[in-house]
Amino acid sequence: MAESHGGGGGCCPPMDLMRSEPMQLVQVIVPMESAHLTVSYLGDLGLVQFKDLNSEKSPFQRTYAAQIKRCGEMARKIRFFKEQMSKAGVTPKETLDRENDIDLDDVEVKLEELEAELVEINANNDKLQRSYNELVEYKLVLEKAGEFFASAHRSATAQQSEIETEQVGEDLLEAPLLQEEKSVDPTKQVKLGFLTGLVPREKSMVFERILFRATRGNIFIRQSVIEESVVDPNSGEKAEKNVFVVFYSGERAKSKILKICEAFGANRYPFSEDLGKQAQMMTEVSGRLSELKTTIGAGLDQRNILLETIGDKFEQWNLKIRKEKAIYHTLNMLSLDVTKKCLVGEGWSPVFAATEIQDALHRAAVDSNSQVGSIFQVLRTKEMPPTFFRTNKFTTAFQEIVDAYGVAKYQEANPSVFTIVTFPFLFAVMFGDWGHGICLLLATMYLILREKKLSSQKLGDIMEMAFGGRYVIFMMSLFSIYTGLIYNEFFSIPYPLFASSAYDCRDVSCSEATTIGLIKTRDTYPFGVDPVWHGTRSELPFLNSLKMKMSILIGVAQMNLGIIMSFFNAKFFKSAVNIWFQFVPQMIFLNCLFGYLSVLIIIKWCTGSQADLYHVMIYMFLSPMDDLGENQLFPNQKIVQLTFLFLALVSVPWMLLPKPFILKKQHEARHQGLSYAQLDETDESLQVETNGGGHGHEEFEFSEIFVHQLIHTIEFVLGAVSNTASYLRLWALSLAHSELSSVFYEKVLLMAWGFNNVFIWIVGILVFIFATVGVLLVMETLSAFLHALRLHWVEYQNKFYEGDGYKFAPFTFTLVGNEDE
């Protein structure tokens, strides 16, 4: 069994999320005849992460390589069917049949038959479609070239009388070469020929130029543009083409023209100069096209019927093949015993799953009619187990936020327990407007109420992220409403929701009022900021002071929580060294400086003192012996400050020096075989510091340990200052959000409302809505989210969280149907 690192008993909250599930390394010995069914049942259970016991073997050397190859071939056929169905617009049908009722051998035979039939149908359809496309081109050649020859014939008839009366006539461009052939002496006649076809339009000019140069101008070419694009018989793609007719003299010229046509992808078709034969060919081609169209339609109908038949069982077959492939992949991770009659497997599983695993093994043995049952046993190991948290749809997103930084080490304190509350709260501190919070809440409620429907749909990347984090956004919106009520801002407008303002103005111009110009006539405003501050000259200084001090208080509280979590870790892992020489000095250092500052802030709020806290903190270091004067907030403050300063200084060497020497002493005692009862209780940290992972015989490098501790100490001391300052981003982003909201309200909405024009009102409202949604509800939300993420990952988690574990990844069929091949 994986070694228990302590009970954690009373020191840790009894939460499922606080510690990862206790894990154990289990071994199963399965007879060969029941191995397949056993792995299948364990995949249905989904609680075992198998270890690869054949890592030294290549995939082709493993026991079930042939079966995986077989499944891969069936998966290829499934992908082929899916591609064909997609092209034909056929949608696979969801099936309620159990995939276990199908036999893989039957599926293989059926897929092979269907593939052969579909390939044959496609081949016939492609052949018919090619013939159809060729006939379409041939018909266009007959039409366009026929027009050219008919025009030439009419021109020849009109010029016949002139040719007879004149012995020498000037060659005209319109006079056909064939007609001139008739007008010359037969004994001197040169044999003329012509070729017809189609050439891609983008190549037509180059085609003509190459022909002219290759024959040295001894050709005559005519081209006619085809208005509509045609499907090329060779490529099957649509293309714009021209019909051409080339006249030449001599076989040599013909040979050159044929080669050029082939090079340019020009399709040639036979053509007769006889008008009667042209008409006959046109009739034959048209009839053939009609027949082919009918035949192709029947072939497509036959293919669609076949694809619909495939679609009825497609999902069932696909799931079966994927499951079988996953099973054989897992079986390849098991090793054969020496008798080659059993398979031995090892893997991690939660302790609570032991009974369920044994039940699955027993059922597999019974269902496979195995004469020998499977053996289940727990192994002892010093390996680090995987980390497994049981989450639900609400907590999953928060756990993913933590895991994005690093997966928790086995049974390390889990930050997401408190992140569920602190993350949306810190976001809301920066996004405090209850109007904007209501908008976020409405958008999130849409996602939550329709989650069943949306979870089954294919969403875009952004929408999928928003849907996955819907409960995070839900919590963010609730806390935004809460902090918005504290800030008393509704789209930057204050409302006296809980009572009237406690103050009245001394004069008419309340916007010029300061605290001196206000008279308190009623009880203090019961909740949040008094609405009277809005619009006054002192609004910004007042809110700045409030939010800045509040940010420091929140930051110090969360950093203290982080250090307290390190105490839970040390207590759970029974590491007294980390408690006394890490937790205690860190708490002293942080609270003697910034905890003290937080107390001063609260005292100043309660007493109304005018003391300058900047002066108090700076001169606490620079001149600790000077009198505080008007900056004194309570009696004996100077003595308290000197005590805190002394404790803070002492805590630094306290963190740095003892731990490395104690670890060295423990290591020496362990190797000398001495018994140190107290030290035995304390340390598992030696293994952590030396990356031993539980191996007690690794070489101890004192210099490395000391340098590591030095770095850790410096990091904490400097981080205490920088991390506290980092929390001031809460104030900065809250101020920015408030000011932007105020600008959009005053400079857009109110300015538009000042015009007595309905069109300007509508434009102003639209601009205000788009600015609010685009800038405040999208960009500001993303900005505040990222800053809250930073505060948790760096300022909070670095106090205790190592995050160097690895996730529990069990063998399961749950997601097999959605996996891409």
Curated annotation (Swiss-Prot):
Signal peptide: none annotated. The modification N-acetylalanine is found at A2. Residues 2-422, 492-549, 604-641, 779-821 are cytoplasmic. It is a multi-pass membrane protein. Residues 444-470, 571-582, 663-757 are vacuolar. Residues 98-145 form a coiled coil. It comes from the Eukaryota. GO terms for molecular function: diphosphate hydrolysis-driven proton transmembrane transporter activity; proton-transporting ATPase activity, rotational mechanism. InterPro entries: V-ATPase_116kDa_su (IPR002490), V-type_ATPase_116kDa_su_euka (IPR026028). Disruption phenotype: When associated with VHA-a3 disruption, day-length-dependent growth retardation associated with a reduced accumulation and storage of nitrate ions in vacuoles. Increased sensitivity to zinc ions due to a lower zinc ions sequestration in vacuoles. Reduced calcium content. No effect on sensitivity to sodium ions. It is found in: Vacuole membrane. One of its GO terms (cellular component) is vacuolar membrane. Keywords: Acetylation, Coiled coil, Hydrogen ion transport, Ion transport, Membrane, Transmembrane, Transmembrane helix, Transport, Vacuole. The chain crosses the membrane at residues 423-443, 471-491, 550-570, 583-603, 642-662, 758-778. GO terms for biological process: proton motive force-driven ATP synthesis; vacuolar proton-transporting V-type ATPase complex assembly; vacuolar sequestering. Pfam families: V_ATPase_I. Expressed in etiolated seedlings hypocotyls. V-ATPase is a heteromultimeric enzyme composed of a peripheral catalytic V1 complex (components A to H) attached to an integral membrane V0 proton pore complex (components: a, c, c'', d and e). Essential component of the vacuolar proton pump (V-ATPase), a multimeric enzyme that catalyzes the translocation of protons across the membranes. Required for assembly and activity of the V-ATPase. Involved in vacuolar nutrient storage (e.g. accumulation and storage of nitrate) and in tolerance to some toxic ions (e.g. zinc ions sequestration in vacuoles). Belongs to the V-ATPase 116 kDa subunit family. This is V-type proton ATPase subunit a2. The gene is VHA-a2.
